[in-house]
């Protein structure tokens, strides 16, 4: 997905929150690519976040997703616009891209992972974690595991298999 490379490269020179990042229509009018609404929102969350599509054309289910995505944007605003940004993968990683936001006070963090390619029989994805306070405790909202920042920073997290790109 081109947008991932754009945001990755731009983040070396500008604050990630200043990058224009919007959920576009699907299929995309420039690339013809079809990407799930949830993935497009995850990528846009690592930027200015917005929608560049005709909301009237969305299904009721998609409108409910948009409402939840906007709520998440507000819930994570302090992280994505005021927190520290970490690139967790290199640009040449062809299977997935991951990044992290950590609050300035280190009380919470947001890790996002986006699968770039679909392959048969995919392996679980392991992601390094950075920037957490060693002596603080953090709970993973994905699986409920509670660990110290030191443990998360050294061990990272292994995610379940991705089944779709």
Regions found by a protein language model. Name each.
Residues 44, 111, 140:
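Conserved, mostly hydrophobic/aromatic
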Residues 1-56:
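Glycan-recognition surfaces
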Residues 23, 27, 41, 55, ...:
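Solvent-exposed, flexible loop/coil residues
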Residues 38-89:
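Catalytic cores of secreted or luminal carbohydrate-active enzymes
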Residues 29-31, 52-54, 60-61, 95, ...:
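Flexible loop/turn segments at secondary-structure boundaries
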Residues 117-165:
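C-terminal beta-sandwich/jelly-roll accessory domains of carbohydrate-active enzymes
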Residues 91-133:
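Carbohydrate-binding surface patches
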Residues 23-37, 97-101, 151-165:
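A broadly tuned preference for mixed-charge, low-complexity surface segments
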């Amino acid at each position: 997905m081109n947008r991932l490379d754009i945001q990755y490269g731009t983040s070396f020179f500008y604050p990630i929150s200043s990058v224009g990042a919007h959920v576009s229509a699907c299929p995309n009018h420039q690339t013809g690519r079809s990407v799930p609404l949830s993935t497009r929102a995850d990528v846009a969350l690592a930027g200015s976040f917005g929608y560049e599509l005709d909301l009237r054309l969305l299904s009721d289910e998609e409108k409910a997703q948009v409402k939840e995505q906007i709520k998440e944007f507000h819930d994570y605003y302090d992280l994505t616009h005021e927190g520290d940004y970490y690139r967790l993968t290199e640009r040449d990683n062809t299977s997935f891209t991951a990044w992290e936001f950590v609050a300035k006070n280190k009380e919470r963090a947001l890790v996002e992972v986006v699968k770039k390619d679909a392959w048969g029989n995919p392996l679980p994805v392991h992601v390094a974690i950075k920037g957490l306070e060693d002596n603080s405790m953090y709970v993973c909202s994905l699986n409920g595991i509670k660990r110290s920042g030191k443990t998360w920073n050294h061990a990272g997290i292994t995610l379940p298999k991705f089944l779709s790109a």
